[in-house]
Amino acid sequence: MRVEDVKPRHIDDMLKGIVDRGAPTIATDVLRWTRRIFDYGIKRHALEINPCSAFEVSDAGGKEVARERWLTRDELIRLFQAMRMAKGFSRQNELTFKLLLTLCVRKMELCAARWEEFDLDGAIWHLPEERSKNGDAIDIPLPSPAVEWLRELRTFSCNSKWVLPARKMQNRMIPHIQESTLPVALAKVRAEMPDVPNYTIHDFRR
């Protein structure tokens, strides 16, 4: 199989095979290393999309204990206020977090999104099969605020084909922002609301 022919379903089959053998820790390590291999392929211009990007560590390690944390309406209001107050928290980060909250997509689905996937006039995001976790293409409706946030993000993207291009020159061998960028940004926001119980970006989807 050619490297560009590897799809998320192949990664899923590989990880499930390891987990089914009773080795979830090994499956987690395999996911990390496989992700790095495909990232290297992107750096060397062998491919443009990492088929591992749709998978979280919990997908490799077997079933995760279900979290019951979600943000209440009051907490969401405080979150939006904190995003405007947090030192070093950019407008791009604010728009990104609002999109994650509104669309309930996985963070890597948004981090690696390209403008060609979006029909802003038709208010649809065409998420291609090679970037979805289950290997099926998905059409995601875009509410009016999301369309406006995306139009604003486009003004920040400097004609890049990526919705969220890498922001530092040393990181541009991977052309879009990495998913690890978002938890770091969220930590700046949480510092502005220390009395609110801990929450993660994954909790945005509940």
Language-model segments: residues:
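Short, basic/aromatic-rich helical patch in the C-terminal catalytic core of site-specific tyrosine
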Residues: 11, 34, 38, 110, ...
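Active-site/catalytic core of tyrosine-dependent DNA strand-transfer enzymes
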Residues: 72-77, 122, 131, 143-196
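DNA/chromatin major-groove-contacting recognition/catalytic segments
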Residues: 51-54, 138-141, 148, 152
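A Lys/Arg-rich helix-loop hairpin that forms a DNA/phosphate-binding surface
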Residues: 1-15, 68, 201-202
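Hydrophobic recognition helices of helix-based DNA-binding modules
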Residues: 37-41, 150-153
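Basic, Lys/Arg- and aromatic-enriched nucleic-acid-binding interface segment
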Residues: 18-33, 43-112, 121, 132-136, ...
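A structural signal for short hydrophobic beta-strand segments in well-ordered beta-sheet cores
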Residues: 116-118
